[in-house]
């Protein structure tokens, strides 16, 4: 193979996966197994619940303590989690260039006419599939 490869991967990054650093570990695995160069990688963070709607409890706050800057204390005394920021920070820590990380910045909870939202629909949702294609 030449120096430029076309490897694709995807990972689900809810709060558990995010605090367990799934984005960072996915990049590390791709580098280890395929010899990828993170500086040449592209990443996309797709639609998901935004920090505007993602109120979390103390269990999540404690589990994500390493990423304290991803939690915002709201006037009601509750914390909201920014999964987009948490995963961006992990991708950057793995060596991806900031300009190579695209975030859809689309909240599924605020856009229920377009997406299912487990949180907004109290678990009574349809399902979404994600595929990665080469053009």
Model-derived segments and spans:
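Active-site microenvironment for binding and transforming phosphate-containing groups
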Residues: 3, 7-135
């Amino acid at each position: 193979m030449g120096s430029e490869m076309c490897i694709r991967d995807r990972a689900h990054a809810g709060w558990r996966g995010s605090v367990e650093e799934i984005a960072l570990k996915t990049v590390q695995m791709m580098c280890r197994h395929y010899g990828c160069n993170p500086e040449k990688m592209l990443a996309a963070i797709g639609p998901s619940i935004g920090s505007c709607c993602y109120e979390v409890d103390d269990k999540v706050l404690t589990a994500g303590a390493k990423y304290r800057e991803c939690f915002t204390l709201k006037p009601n005394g509750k914390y909201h989690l920014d999964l987009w920021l948490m995963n961006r920070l992990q991708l950057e820590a793995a060596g991806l260039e900031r300009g190579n990380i695209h975030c859809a910045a689309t909240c599924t909870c605020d856009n229920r006419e377009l997406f299912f939202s487990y949180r907004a629909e109290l678990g009574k949702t349809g399902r979404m599939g994600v595929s990665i294609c080469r053009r």
